[in-house]
Amino acid sequence: LECHNQQSSQPPTTKSCPGDTNCYNKRWRDHRGTIIERGCGCPTVKPGINLKCCTTDRCNN
């Protein structure tokens, strides 16, 4: 599986995720605005954080 791993509005980058079946896109707001984190897997998140997990290559941009 290949997942995007750039932060927020950085240019797209990807990484290979051997053994993982999900990519995630996690977003929340703080004093800097909306923060977006992307990566491999499907993490547990705290309330108030918007999480999307998906299962195809580069699906989490």
UniProtKB/Swiss-Prot annotation:
It holds the Pfam family Toxin_cobra-type. SUPFAM superfamilies: Snake toxin-like. It is found in: Secreted. Expressed by the venom gland. GO terms for molecular function: acetylcholine receptor inhibitor activity; ion channel regulator activity; toxin activity. This is Short neurotoxin 1. Residues 1-16 have a biased composition (Polar residues). CDD domains: TFP_snake_toxin. Binds to muscle nicotinic acetylcholine receptor (nAChR) and inhibit acetylcholine from binding to the receptor, thereby impairing neuromuscular transmission. Belongs to the three-finger toxin family. Short-chain subfamily. Type I alpha-neurotoxin sub-subfamily. Keywords: Acetylcholine receptor inhibiting toxin, Disulfide bond, Ion channel impairing toxin, Neurotoxin, Postsynaptic neurotoxin, Secreted, Toxin. Residues 1-20 are annotated as: Disordered.
